[in-house]
């Protein structure tokens, strides 16, 4: 299959490596210097150092040329880049199926990725999300990984999963696109909370409680948006939550660890040097939960800490001071 990956960041590079043995690939880069580096050294020193891009992967900075001839497009930008990318596809009259790997709610609109794509390309456009417990570094290194592929057409999900599946990247088809996207978005917020918990030295009991109650928050929001409950017990729910909350490669977890040290958010993001989607998603989740009347106290506490309304320690005190509840109510 001819696949074009749009975006030469960590995920675009990692998936180019992962899919290279099975497909005819083109990696499109917006940054000319990144493309030049990839062509000359076969390494993305700016965004993803330490991993070699196979010679078989073509690198392009010409958007129209990169898209031409492809059978499948994979948008590998942060969510902030999703709309501009699909708008360029729409301008070309592109009718190709589109997948994305970004996770979150669009800043300002609060839309999930599939809503953004449908708004730009039309509801009839074949599209879907590749999501689950996966760090780009481990995917590029060929470590065994399993993810979900959810689309707006079950037959397309099954066929795309079959085509993209490799011996190192196991892909499960899923027909709950909303659930997969909500799981991938909100877990980033909860990873910040877990980082705060660990950074304050609150212990493993606290971490386990936070993750479990956080999963309940994901499910409540997802159900309010029309998702299926069982999705949150799978790879894009519990699986991604566990990885992002406990893995040291998690940018969102590292944000939480730094917040526990009372570092300012601008300083944290500057030191991180990469996008941490949970920082932006927290505010959208907080607004969406309020609008839908969904109780999400952990996510709300994260938003309050990020906005400077609470310190990390105050947020913990506030959560623990809440009235007793029935666990499964």
Swiss-Prot record:
- A Pfam family hit: NAD_Gly3P_dh_C
**What organism is recorded for this protein?**
Dechloromonas aromatica (strain RCB)
Entry annotated with the keyword Acetylation: no
Would I find GTP-binding among this entry's keywords? no
**Recorded metabolic or biological pathway in which this protein acts:** Membrane lipid metabolism; glycerophospholipid metabolism
Its subcellular locations are: Cytoplasm
The cross-references to HAMAP family, in alphabetical order and at most eight, read: NAD_Glyc3P_dehydrog
- Residue sites binding sn-glycerol 3-phosphate per the record: 103, 132, 134, 187, 240, 250-252
| UniProt binding sites for NADPH | 11, 30, 103, 136, 251, 275, 277
Which gene underlies this protein?
Answer: gpsA
The protein's enzyme class:
oxidoreductase
Q: Spell out the protein name for this chain.
A: Glycerol-3-phosphate dehydrogenase [NAD(P)+]
An annotated Gene Ontology molecular function: glycerol-3-phosphate dehydrogenase [NAD(P)+] activity
């Amino acid at each position: 299959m001819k696949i074009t990956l749009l975006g030469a960041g960590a995920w675009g590079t990692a998936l180019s490596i992962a899919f290279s043995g099975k497909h005819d690939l083109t990696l499109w880069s917006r940054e000319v210097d990144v493309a030049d580096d990839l062509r000359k050294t076969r390494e993305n020193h700016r965004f993803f150092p330490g991993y070699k891009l196979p010679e078989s992967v073509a690198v392009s900075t010409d958007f129209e040329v990169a898209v031409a001839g492809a059978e499948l497009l994979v948008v590998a930008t942060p969510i902030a880049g999703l709309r501009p990318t699909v708008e360029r596809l729409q301008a070309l009259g592109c009718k190709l199926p589109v997948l994305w790997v970004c996770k979150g709610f669009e800043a300002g609109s609060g839309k999930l990725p599939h809503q953004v794509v449908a708004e730009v390309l039309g509801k009839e456009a074949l599209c879907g999300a590749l999501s689950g417990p996966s760090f780009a570094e481990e995917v590029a290194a060929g470590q065994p990984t399993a993810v979900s592929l959810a689309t707006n057409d079950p037959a397309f999900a099954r066929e795309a999963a079959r085509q993209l599946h490799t011996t190192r990247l196991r892909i499960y088809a899923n027909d709950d696109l909303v659930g997969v996207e909500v799981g991938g978005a909100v877990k980033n917020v909860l990873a910040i909370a877990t980082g705060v918990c660990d950074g304050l030295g609150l212990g493993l009991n606290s971490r386990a409680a936070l993750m479990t109650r956080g999963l309940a928050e994901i499910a409540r929001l997802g159900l309010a948006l029309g998702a299926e409950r069982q999705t949150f017990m799978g790879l894009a729910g519990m699986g991604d939550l566990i990885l992002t909350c406990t893995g040291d490669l998690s940018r969102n977890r590292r944000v939480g660890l730094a917040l526990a040290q009372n570092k300012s958010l601008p300083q944290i993001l500057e030191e991180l040097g990469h996008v941490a989607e949970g920082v932006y998603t927290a505010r959208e989740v907080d607004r969406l939960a309020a609008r839908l009347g969904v109780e999400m106290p952990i996510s709300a506490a994260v938003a309050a800490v990020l906005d400077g309304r609470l310190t990390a320690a105050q947020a913990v005190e506030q959560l623990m001071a809440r009235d007793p509840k029935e666990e499964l109510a």
